[in-house]
Amino acid sequence: MRIVDVCGFYAPQGGGVKTYVERKLKAARPGHEEVIILAPGARDGTVREEAGGAIVTLATPRFPLDRRYRYFDNEAALHGLLDRLAPDVVEVSSPWASPAMVARWPGAAFRSLVMHADPLSAYAYRWFGGVASREVIDRGFDWFWRHLRRLDRQFDMVVSASESLSARLRAGGLGKVATIPMGVEPGIFSPERRDPALRARLLARCGLAPSATLLIGIGRLASEKRWPMVIEAVTAAGYSQPVGLVLFGNGRDRARVVRAADNNPHVHLGAPILDRAELATVLASADALVHGCEAETFCMVAAEAKASGLPLIVPDDGGAGDQFAAGQGCRYEARNPAALAAAIVAFVAGSPAAHRARAVTAAAGVPDMDAHFARLFATYAALGGRWSDAA
């Protein structure tokens, strides 16, 4: 079964999507599945080959709002490459222009729309949530819901990584939604990587002793991640308890994040962690992951933290909230800095060690990516086979 993933969100400097698609190549079983990642790039060509497939790029322009990324703009060229690749299954992982291009491709492949992004949460709900309810916002963005319902009719399947997103898509009128949760890279994240000396060094960067509570934040410095809100909440919580925050990341919102952290010596900003083993060690060595974004469809870093035995302090909405387990951290009202500050205070007062002990016990049960891909490939084989027979 040849699967072509038309992946508009892939970039060499990318985060969760890059991790996801590169693991997909490793999960494909030669002789059973062949995975071709078709990504926008600087030039036409093959940029990586694995036993289970390859990453192929189509020459495209840069995305003007984030120049790390590119976007598909030539439908004829995309159709021509799909003709040459002749997939049995074609996936699209962007809800914008590329799925409409794939829907118009005349090939006979099984079509799957994978919801790696949730634009309504990332943009509309964030921009207008302070002045209107979600129901009102949805009515204002009915053009986008009509677009999604049209794609639902044109595609054979819509894949969602979390039940909360699936429920919202179904409520919006989509009828082909299947929830297939993602997972973490196998063999990397573990509570056994905990390093007390590293924990002490990170707290020292925050000007705090090892007796303080160490919170870790990881992610792009972008407005939807709400890092200034997180910093504000950590600062407020720090008036009653010694709490340090180490935030690893980079992005277009860096100047705003730096300004937010300027007045708190207990907040340290670090560069992105590119080495996966180092990331796993940092996660296992902290006392909790703190997260401000409610717009992710899955929240890979929260899953990686859980697999590392790390409690979560996360919003009650979106992919991060779906990762939460009672007794292993705190959940707070999304978009509310006062609620986040109260959650941090409650976490510290409620014994971080006890929260971590429960999280360590649960860590082995966090699903890995290979299980996700095995289920995804099996679903394609079953549904695609029936669809082909029906055709």
Predicted regions and their residues:
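Carbohydrate-associated surface elements
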Residues: G41, S164, G183
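Membrane-proximal helix-turn-helix segments that form the acceptor-binding/catalytic region
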Residues: P119, I137-M157
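Conserved donor-binding/catalytic core segment of Leloir-type glycosyltransferases
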Residues: L203-A204, A209-K225, I231-V234
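Nucleotide-activated donor-binding/catalytic signature segment of Leloir-type glycosyltransferases, i.e.
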Residues: A255-A277
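Conserved acidic donor-binding segment of nucleotide-sugar-dependent glycosyltransferases
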Residues: L269, A326-P337, V345-P352
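Aromatic "clamp/platform" in nucleotide-sugar-dependent glycosyltransferases that forms part
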Residues: E294
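A charged, aromatic-enriched C-terminal amphipathic alpha-helix characteristic of glycosyltransferases
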Residues: A353-G385
